[in-house]
Every structure is written in structure tokens, then in C-alpha cells.
């Protein structure tokens, strides 16, 4: 059976943490930032975890992670 391929878009967007949760970047931080407050932009700065209901589909996209 051939090797499974990792989705290139998923490997650029997600990473697996040591505890098994999946790390992702925050959305809404690329452009149109002038109308957003400093507080909103500060909260969007850090990474967050993928929701547990979406984690299975993300893991299927990255079989060797």
C-alpha cells in the first residue's frame, strides 16, 4: 500500500503539541487592522488550540504528525 500524503495546507497551519492538542494561529489578524482596537489585536496575537470536534479531521490531514 502506498504512503499517505500529508496535506500541505494543514502542515503549514497546524502543529501538534506535546500533550496531543493541535495548535493553530488566530484568524482576523492579516489586514483591515485599523478599525480593530489594540485590545482585540493583542488577544489575536497568540496561538490557540483547535476545537476537539475539529481535531479528528485535522489529524486525518496529517497522518504522520
Swiss-Prot record:
Key words of the record: Ribonucleoprotein, Ribosomal protein
Superkingdom of source: Bacteria
SUPFAM superfamilies (alphabetical): L35p-like
One GO CC term, this protein: cytosolic large ribosomal subunit
Ribosomal protein recorded as keyword: yes
Record has Ribonucleoprotein as a keyword: yes
Pfam family, one: Ribosomal_L35p
GO MF annotation list: structural constituent of ribosome
Chain segments carrying region Disordered: 1-21
GO biological process, one term: translation
Biased composition (Basic residues): 1-15
Family (UniProt): Belongs to the bacterial ribosomal protein bL35 family.
NCBIfam families xref list: rpmI_bact (TIGR00001)
Name of this chain's protein: Large ribosomal subunit protein bL35
Organism the protein comes from: Dechloromonas aromatica (strain RCB)
Encoding gene per record: rpmI
Amino acid at each position: 500500500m502506498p504512503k499517505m500524503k500529508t496535506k500541505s495546507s494543514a502542515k503549514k497551519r497546524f502543529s501538534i503539541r506535546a500533550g496531543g492538542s493541535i495548535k493553530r494561529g488566530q484568524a482576523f489578524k492579516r489586514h483591515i487592522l485599523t478599525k480593530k482596537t489594540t485590545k482585540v489585536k493583542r488577544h489575536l496575537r497568540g496561538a490557540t488550540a483547535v476545537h476537539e470536534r475539529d481535531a479528528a479531521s485535522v489529524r486525518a490531514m496529517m497522518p504522520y504528525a
